[in-house]
């Protein structure tokens, strides 16, 4: 979680990135995607198109996703595939997700995955859309991280943010 938070703190400094909630129901996520819709100009055709981009960060994957909620899992698979989504309710009207673009970084443990991922999450395609990063040991133990920081830390952070801005502008 600490490492993910460092990266997300850098990304939050980049203008134009839409961040979603870290704890959400699938219905609220559809609503958030609808609100995140924005227009962009296709550099090839000069045509204006709509997209619904969202970046979600969750310090605990289990807070973001209930693996037993098949509707949420199926909706995430559809969103990752770039499929549009329309939700219509009797009292709340409708929410449209056009050209979704979803990025999720969520932290958990191998034990949580083993104990909570049912077979359909693996066979149904959810895990094939995920990149699992795992380390079985710490690279180094640092009791007081502030004492181990390089003197040019602020400059390095600025350069990383500038790189992220460059990537986001493409």
Predicted feature descriptions by range:
Residues 1-170:
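Phosphate-handling catalytic cores of nucleic-acid transaction enzymes
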